[in-house]
Amino acid sequence: MAKTHEIKVERRADEGKGASRRLRHAGVIPAIVYGGELEPVSIQLNHEQIWLAQQNEWFYSSILDLNLNGDVQQVLLRDMQRHPFKQLIMHIDFQRVSANEKLSAAVPLHFINEASSPAGKSSEVVVTHELNEVQVVCLPKDLPEFIEVDLGALEVGNVIHLSEIKLPAGVEIPELKLGKEHDVAVVAAKHVRIEEDDAAGEEGSEGAETK
């Protein structure tokens, strides 16, 4: 069962640029909820509460419970506009989700056991994370906050592809249905040893220049 997080909201009475500007000056974020069989609803949220929430990974990848005076609607964050240089959220879009309809969402990847892997223990290997998130399709109840990628057995020269990620039950990666060329690398362990002869040659050149 996916975790949910409750956020209290209020209905927004006034709309337009002027009204939105006044809300922001009062520490309130203008927002909208759309999707499903209901009409779009203009809402407003406490800026301080959302500023703290958006610092957490779950805010972007989890089902959120919007509580409007006791009426709770399940939504996903679909867009968040920020001020270009101020610590200010300008506007938020939320999309309603239906318990019986699959949704598409970007889910973060958490890489574990890298340091203890054969590749991670080598000073001559660089482990690169080619992807930090993956687009999945699933029912709301199956949406994970993150997906773990276990690197414990990663060897020098190994590449882990998208198809090798262990997915939770009920979760699919639609990209993999588009063909083998879409089975991209997620992690690569590359050998980057510098030859001793090259290093010695560089030191000799530096010594000659200082004479």
Swiss-Prot record:
Alphabetical list of Pfam families matching this protein: Ribosomal_L25p, Ribosomal_TL5_C
Ribosomal protein is among the record's keywords: yes
UniProt keyword terms in alphabetical order: Ribonucleoprotein, Ribosomal protein, RNA-binding, rRNA-binding
Gene Ontology biological process terms, A to Z: translation
Top-rank taxon: Bacteria
Gene Ontology cellular component terms for the protein in this record: cytosolic large ribosomal subunit
A single MF term (Gene Ontology): 5S rRNA binding
SUPFAM superfamilies: Ribosomal protein L25-like (SSF50715)
Gene3D superfamilies the UniProt entry points to: Ribosomal protein L25, beta domain (2.170.120.20), Ribosomal Protein L25, Chain P (2.40.240.10)
InterPro entries named in the record: Rbsml_bL25/Gln-tRNA_synth_N, Ribosomal_bL25/Gln-tRNA_synth, Ribosomal_bL25_b-dom, Ribosomal_bL25_C, Ribosomal_bL25_long, Ribosomal_bL25_short, Ribosomal_L25_dom, Ribosomal_uL5_bac-type
The keyword Zinc-finger is annotated on this UniProt entry: no
Role noted for this protein: This is one of the proteins that binds to the 5S RNA in the ribosome where it forms part of the central protuberance.
Record-linked HAMAP family: Ribosomal_bL25 (MF_01336), Ribosomal_bL25_CTC (MF_01334)
Protein family: Belongs to the bacterial ribosomal protein bL25 family. CTC subfamily.
PANTHER family per the UniProt record, alphabetical: RIBOSOMAL PROTEIN L25/GLN-TRNA SYNTHETASE, ANTI-CODON-BINDING DOMAIN-CONTAINING PROTEIN (PTHR33284), RIBOSOMAL PROTEIN L25_GLN-TRNA SYNTHETASE, ANTI-CODON-BINDING DOMAIN-CONTAINING PROTEIN (PTHR33284:SF1)
Quaternary structure (record): Part of the 50S ribosomal subunit; part of the 5S rRNA/L5/L18/L25 subcomplex. Contacts the 5S rRNA. Binds to the 5S rRNA independently of L5 and L18.
This protein's name: Large ribosomal subunit protein bL25
Gene encoding the protein: rplY
